[in-house]
Amino acid sequence: MQFPSLSCGILIKRYKRFLADILLPNGEQITLHCPNTGAMTGCATAGDTVWFSTSDNPKRKYAHTWELTQTQAGDFICVNTQRANQLVQEALEKRWIAELAEYQTVLPEQKYGSENSRIDFLLKADNQPDCFVEVKSTTLLTENGLGMFPDAKTERGQKHLRELAAIAESGQQAVIFFAILHTGIQRFAVAKQIDPQYAALFEQAKNTGVKVLAYKAQIELVQGKPEAMNLQFSCEI
């Protein structure tokens, strides 16, 4: 996945969930749109480098969108949650996900389930049951390279696990796919200490046959500037 042309600045602060102030190299201070409603723990530390895209849409109140954080330790974190589904769709269509490479058709945003949900991707293949894939953007790095999800309690995430478990029980394929968008993460676990109910439902879903996958994003740099990101390598669970 190619990034739009990116510029950078130094993070001053994130506030009101959707906004962030940064300082540009020329000394100008600007406000960005932050496309991430989560806690963003470890992703929004003052002094980190922010990489942002710029829209030419004159109707936008804030023309700039926060795409990546480059931490002072040198890690890159994709904070634009919309990129997770774009990455996974590209990986599915290019057959980079070995466990799902047999599926020829990738349908995004399909309605399903008894709780009025939308699945991120419905996969179809000849002579195979349909496969329902729910994507979770993962950016929380705890310690020793361990990444975790969720970074806050998530009733929506709990609903998705119930829906996936019901799909698996019906005889169809169900997958929860953790897109690891922090280059410092080397392995993955569910954050039981943050959301015990999510962790319990996660174990129940696995026991009903829901498959768990975690793949790590790779950032391609050109002269130190992020140019592209792809999702080709699995992450230890």
UniProtKB/Swiss-Prot annotation:
Signal peptide: none annotated. Pfam families: SfsA, SfsA_N. GO terms for molecular function: DNA binding. Belongs to the SfsA family. This is Sugar fermentation stimulation protein homolog.
